[in-house]
Structures are given as C-alpha cells and as structure tokens.
Amino acid sequence: ERSHIFSSFFYKQLTRKDTSGPEETGSTSAYRRHQRVRTWTRHVDIFSKDYLFIPVNHEAHWYLVLICFPALERPQIVEWRQKSSVSQDESQTTKERPSGESQRESSQQPKGNPSKINESRSHNLPDCTVHSCTKETICKRPCILIMDSLKLSYHQRTYTLLREYLQVEWEVRKGSCRSFSNESITGSLCRVPLQDNSSDCGLYLLQYVESFLQNPVVDFALPLRLDQWFPRSQVRKKREDLRELVLLLYRRQTEPRAT
C-alpha cells in the first residue's frame, strides 16, 4: 500500500530518444517524455505512496532508483522509538516464543556475554533501518535515492529527468503547479553493498528492493550508509532462489486442476 514498483521498461520508455522537435508538438521535452508514459500510472496516484521503486538500465548495467515521500514539500522530524523500547520489544518477542524454540536458539548461540553478542549483531546493521534504529527522532525527507552496485557517478541526468517527470505528473494529476527542484527533492547516491564481478548488477537490484521491503530505511539523514545491509553470500544464492521460484510457479500452472 505504501509502495509502488514501476515496470523495468518504464525508465527506458521515459527516456526514449525523441525525434520530434518542439515546433512540431508545441510542448517542452519534459511534457513529451511524460506523454510517453502518462498511462503507466492511470490506476495509481504515485503521490499517495511513500516509496517508488524504479529499475534503471543504462548501457547494459542495472541499478535502482528509489523516490521517497514524493508528496512531502520539506523534510520532517518525527518521533521514533528509543533503544529501551527496542530491547523491550525483543524481550516481549522472546516471551511469546515456545519454550522449546527458545531453548534451541539458546543452545545454538555462541557462549559469552549476551550483551556483547547483541551489541555485535546490532553493530553490523545500518543504524538508519527499522530493525536497528535507536534514535529518539528520525528524519523523513523527499529524496531520490540511487542504489548502484558499481558505485558509478553518471546519475545527474537521472535525477533531472525524474524531477521533471514528477513535476509534470503532479500538474496532470493534481491540477496545480509545484516545483520539484534539487532543493525540494534531493538526489543522493547511497552507500550499499557492491558487486565483485561484472554480471550481478541485476541480482543486486533485486536484493536492494527485497532488503528495503524487509528492513526499510526509517531515518533519511543523507547520505545513507547501508554498506552492511546484507551479506554478499545472500546475493550469490539469488539465482538459485529465482530458479526454484520459476519452477514452483511452473508446476502450479501445469498441475491438473481438481474437478
């Protein structure tokens, strides 16, 4: 409900080379680009969403664009739970587990000071995500985040084109004018886990989306440092996971239906 995932063809269609000139159409390039994708959001108001996921392919390389809080006009500071609340939640979760499960987990944990073990675990997680944030207040801000597993730096045009798209979409959808400038919706390159080869960019894009949905960012103090968001081993088995999912769906579709 809070998110919308665009098709992997959306950005390609938005940025498709324009062969017509302004004198032929009577409109600016931003309006002509929006015209090409205007029907892609006819059933959804993207400004009612907190997060917009846009897969981007540039020169055979995939990366993720995440537009956050597009309806906000300025950053907001809101209250967040404190560290004691997090500990209390974890304590409550432990109480609700079956005793046998708790004993099994206890026997599998390394021996040592429990507080140090918990501290070590939380230290490895980004401190801006829902599972590890211990701040009293957090920052929600309208922004365009880029998660690139190759840490490339040619994204300025991406920020510009998407700001223009949002501006025209707002005008068409809301019937009023609003500026989506660099000051009102900041662009930022996130520090994320990086690939160690030349072929896994698509897998990392999928993992960025999955990790955000499972352990979303809650404090948008830029730039986001998500280096420890997930281990590289998690991406290495992603192809096998996808293969098993495809085979599962295939079996479900080919099984004879009960009459």
Residue ranges and their predicted role:
Residues E1-H131, C139-C143, H155:
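Cysteine protease catalytic domains with a Cys-His-Asp triad
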Residues P142, L150-S153, R157-A258:
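C-terminal folded domains that constitute the principal catalytic or ligand-binding module
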